[in-house]
Amino acid sequence: RGLTLGGGFNEPKYLATQTSPKPRIDRSELNGFRTARLINPRDLNPFGDPIKTQAPKDISFYKPMSDEVFKVYSRSFEGNSSPLNQELKYKDDSHPLWNKERVLVNTGYNNEKMDILVFTPKNNFGKSPVVIFHPGANYYTTPPEIDEVGPGEFGLDFLIKSGRTIIWPAWKGSLNRMPSVALSPEQRIRNFRDLFRYWISDTQKTFDYIASRQDLDIDNVFYLGMSYGALFNTHNLLFEDRYKGALLYVGGNFPTYPPMADGINHMPRINTPFLMLNGEDDYLVPKSAAMLFYNSTGTPEEDKKIIFYNSGHWPLPRNQMIKESLSFIEKYSN
């Protein structure tokens, strides 16, 4: 197999900067037939060489904090009790499966506000369990307009059909909260610790919003991270103990961030039940990165599960994904 860079006209925008494993002779309508005129035939040689990817650091590289140091470190992630001052921007009931609401709330930091998208199942009676969603990297780089966002893009409508509400916060740095100036890769890494802190605050405000609604079940809230949202989720699970469990699609640990920001230092402190669904041929999140996350957490073996499918990064086999996800949620719901 070789690696194909980029995406077709009818594929997600984020594929423009991603690679996917495909046979070298693949000439589907998405890949086409590519030609090049080389001034020197030797210029072609590097294209046949193996591609080296950065492997995760050995677990011995990381040194968990002592309880005393962690207590001090945790102070920067403490929540605030500022009022939500929520404002309903609109409610759209045109979809046959769900009602969509866009709600604006205060974040409690930098005088910023955050939109929360709420997708509630139609004809639902009683309190609805909740799934808080954190999407992939394209929502931080090439996002759609916030009013165009819906769970159907990732095939998450099965959650709504099963009676769950999907809540999609406009996480700091994503959607209509992207930085006004593009950051360099170096700046992005330096800013990551602050971004984690903002995400924790965004999570706390999202829980406050859920608690303010009589039709949502604050005692049955699950986390769903997909790709980016399943790679950089450690602090989310560490500092928010109200999650009943976490669904992590094509996630793991990335080796490119400093130890204090990538979260591995803190993983033994995580005890949240979780389900990981990954692809065997995922070149973006290799198996070693997924297993590093799985093996490093403090979650008991009986409360965590990982499955590798015969797939790349995304999509995963839909029927199996639905079956495993709903089974996990049912197991850990009240």
Predicted features, each with a name:
Residues 77-126:
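N-terminal cap/lid segment of alpha/beta-hydrolase-fold proteins
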